[in-house]
Amino acid sequence: MGCGMSTEDKEGKARNEEIENQLKRDKMMQRNEIKMLLLGAGESGKSTILKQMKLIHEGGYSRDERESFKEIIFSNTVQSMRVILEAMESLELPLEDQRMEYHVQTIFMQPAQIEGDVLPPEVGSAIEAVWKDRGVQDCFKRSREYQLNDSARYYFDNIARIAAPDYMPNDQDVLRSRVKTTGITETTFIIGDLTYRMFDVGGQRSERKKWIHCFENVTTILFLVAISEYDQLLFEDETVNRMQEALTLFDSICNSRWFIKTSIILFLNKIDRFKEKLPVSPMKNYFPDYEGGDDYAAACDYILNRFVSLNQHETKQIYTHFTCATDTTQIRFVMAAVNDIIIQENLRLCGLI
């Protein structure tokens, strides 16, 4: 009787080899697939980073996609002006030119969601006229006292172009548009040999309980903080400072048992607004131990140290970048640096460095 393998044994061996090879392929694929979780408090710039990834790595937005942003941009613009006009009432700030009252009524008559391909010309004219009023400008300067979209001034300054009949949103218009993120959105893109699956989760408090679904096998956390909000209060709770909320959230994420082995990249975002605010809104009013006055570098160092010092793990490194999420050139450079960090972390985890 021969000692050769039976047909059944050969088939079993072949199946085992195929399973082992598939497991190896899966492991290689996992190493090349980066699961990145975008975290941060509401309005910190997470969705803007995702839009930048589309611009930088996916060839940008098609004409149809740009068209789809029109209603969002129109609604953002009208709603922002309405917020200012309502704030003028509560802050008891009058219009300088009472003839503007007609335009104010036009703005208040608009629905919350503007529909259509063109902003009605009377609405564009009303916003353009009212934005020039000194009373409106004075109220805008006090925007930290109420909840105003960061992009308000940008859209008001560009209202003539936005209200034109042939208007087509450009990259900046799209990047600055704001829709509250609810639930979890996933974006996939490729950088070099790595495939990124980037998850954006709602930043408002009511959305945070949904983050748990994203936690498994996360390679990296990209945590965003709007440092320009050091003097603002939460949308959901106007007794809580936004920067304090971000510090509390970062503490809970950085030191969570879920993320002991997860690399964390911290984007200290909205540096353009931060630099503008420092001379007119002293940081010491909100953080009494800060001693740097309106010096931009000193203020950046202070905030950086406040976040990094929360890390309780000696072996865990927090990678930090100061960013302006609407600046495509800068985000392209920063994300290239992030990619290098992730490659190094992958090699280290695989024992290759």
Curated annotation (Swiss-Prot):
Mg(2+) binds at residues 47, 181. GO terms for biological process: G protein-coupled receptor signaling pathway; pheromone-dependent signal transduction involved in conjugation with cellular fusion. Gene3D superfamilies: GI Alpha 1, domain 2-like, P-loop containing nucleotide triphosphate hydrolases. Residues 1-25 are annotated as: Disordered. Residues 323-328 are annotated as: G5 motif. Residues 35-48 are annotated as: G1 motif. This is Guanine nucleotide-binding protein subunit alpha. The lineage of its organism: Eukaryota, Fungi, Dikarya, Ascomycota, Pezizomycotina. The gene is CTG1.
